[in-house]
C-alpha cells in the first residue's frame, strides 16, 4: 500500500459542478471539464532530473516551489487553500527532530534526511491530487491515491485546528509550533488531547513511509 513512486497518471483538480459532462475548455496545458482540470504538462509539479546534483539550498527551494504550485490542486475552497499554505510554511521552518522527540521519546532511530523526506512528502501530495485515467485497469494505484487524499484532508483539518487554537490565544503558538509541549503524554490539557493523538499518529505514519507530513 502507498508506494511512494511518482504517479504516472494525470494530475487533476476537482471542479464544482459534478453533474455536467464534456470538455468545457482545452488549452496547451490542460483540459478543463465540469468535474476536473486535467493537466497535460506535469513538469512544473515534478522535481527536475538535476535535483540530485543541485546544492542543498537549491533542493530546498525546488521542493518549496513545487509544494506551493500544488495549492490550486489541493482544494477549491479558500479556507482549505489557506490552511495548506500555512501548513507548507510551517513544515519548512519547524524543528521536526524536536517534534518527533516529544511525540516518540522512546524512538532512538535517526531522523530521515530532510531533503529525502521532503521528496517523499511531495510525491505523497502529488498522489493525493491525482486521478487514474482508467481506474479499473489499476485499482491498487487508484486506491492508494484515494487513501493519500483522505490522509491529506485529515492533515489539513489538524492544521486548521491549530490555527483556531492560536487565533483564540496567540500564546499557544509556543506550545503548538515551538516546543511541541502538547505532544508530551504527560501534558494534561483536554484542549490538546485529540490534536495530540492525531499528530502522534501522523508522526508514526511518517516513520513508516519516510515522509514529513
From Swiss-Prot:
What does the UniProt keyword field contain? Sporulation
Q: Does the record's keyword annotation contain Glycoprotein?
A: no
Q: Under what name is this protein listed?
A: Increased recombination centers protein 19
Functional note: Involved in sporulation and maintenance of the mitochondrial DNA. Is probably involved in a pathway contributing to genomic integrity.
What the entry lists under InterPro entries is as follows: Irc19
Superkingdom of origin: Eukaryota
Q: Which organism is it from?
A: Eremothecium gossypii (strain ATCC 10895 / CBS 109.51 / FGSC 9923 / NRRL Y-1056)
Report if keyword Transmembrane is assigned. Answer: no
Q: Which family does it belong to?
A: Belongs to the IRC19 family.
GO biological process assignments? ascospore formation; double-strand break repair; mitotic recombination
Amino acid at each position: 500500500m502507498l508506494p511512494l513512486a511518482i504517479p504516472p497518471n494525470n494530475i487533476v483538480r476537482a471542479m464544482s459542478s459534478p453533474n455536467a459532462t464534456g470538455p468545457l475548455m482545452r488549452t496547451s496545458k490542460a483540459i478543463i471539464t465540469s468535474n476536473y482540470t486535467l493537466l497535460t504538462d506535469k513538469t512544473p509539479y515534478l522535481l527536475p532530473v538535476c535535483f540530485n546534483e543541485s546544492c542543498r539550498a537549491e533542493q530546498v527551494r525546488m521542493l518549496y516551489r513545487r509544494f506551493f504550485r500544488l495549492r490550486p490542486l489541493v482544494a477549491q475552497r479558500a479556507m482549505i487553500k489557506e490552511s495548506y499554505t500555512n501548513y507548507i510554511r510551517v513544515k519548512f521552518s519547524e524543528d521536526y527532530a524536536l517534534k518527533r522527540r516529544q511525540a516518540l521519546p522512546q524512538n532512538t532511530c535517526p531522523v530521515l534526511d530532510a531533503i529525502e523526506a521532503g521528496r517523499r512528502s511531495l510525491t505523497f501530495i502529488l498522489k493525493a491530487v491525482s486521478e487514474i485515467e482508467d481506474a479499473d485497469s489499476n485499482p491498487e494505484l487508484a486506491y492508494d491515491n484515494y487513501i493519500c487524499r483522505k490522509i491529506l484532508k485529515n492533515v489539513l483539518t489538524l492544521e486548521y485546528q491549530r490555527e483556531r487554537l492560536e487565533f483564540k490565544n496567540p500564546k499557544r503558538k509556543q506550545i503548538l509550533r515551538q516546543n511541541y509541549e502538547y505532544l508530551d503524554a504527560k501534558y494534561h490539557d483536554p484542549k490538546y488531547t485529540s490534536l495530540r493523538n492525531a499528530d502522534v499518529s501522523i508522526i508514526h505514519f511518517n516513520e513508516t513511509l519516510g515522509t514529513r507530513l
